[in-house]
């Protein structure tokens, strides 16, 4: 269970880092938002899911 929690936290940190760099790049590019809207929404949905997963796993561990 601890390994699953650690992997979920790592995935959350990695996704946060990717979104931290990727979202401003998408907004700064001329046609970035219209062509990459689905990617940004998918990344945000993944991030929200990981936040809930980390919270659930944390409550099971402690």
Swiss-Prot record:
GO biological process: photosynthesis; photosystem II stabilization
Entry annotated with the keyword Membrane: yes
InterPro entries assigned: PSII_PsbZ, PSII_PsbZ_sf
Membrane topology value: Multi-pass membrane protein
One Pfam family it belongs to: Ycf9
One annotated Gene Ontology cellular component of this protein: chloroplast thylakoid membrane
Tree of life domain: Eukaryota
Keywords: Chloroplast, Membrane, Photosynthesis, Photosystem II, Plastid, Reaction center, Thylakoid, Transmembrane, Transmembrane helix
Residues that span the membrane, as ranges: 8-28, 41-61
Cellular location(s): Plastid, Chloroplast thylakoid membrane
Biological function: May control the interaction of photosystem II (PSII) cores with the light-harvesting antenna, regulates electron flow through the 2 photosystem reaction centers. PSII is a light-driven water plastoquinone oxidoreductase, using light energy to abstract electrons from H(2)O, generating a proton gradient subsequently used for ATP formation.
Subunit and interaction comment: PSII is composed of 1 copy each of membrane proteins PsbA, PsbB, PsbC, PsbD, PsbE, PsbF, PsbH, PsbI, PsbJ, PsbK, PsbL, PsbM, PsbT, PsbY, PsbZ, Psb30/Ycf12, at least 3 peripheral proteins of the oxygen-evolving complex and a large number of cofactors. It forms dimeric complexes.
Name of the featured protein: Photosystem II reaction center protein Z
């Amino acid at each position: 269970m601890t390994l699953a929690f650690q992997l979920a936290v790592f995935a959350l940190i990695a996704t946060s880092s990717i979104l931290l760099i990727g979202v401003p790049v998408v907004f700064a590019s001329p046609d970035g938002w219209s062509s990459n809207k689905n990617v940004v929404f998918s990344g945000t949905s993944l991030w929200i899911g990981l936040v809930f997963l980390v919270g659930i796993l944390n409550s099971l561990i402690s």
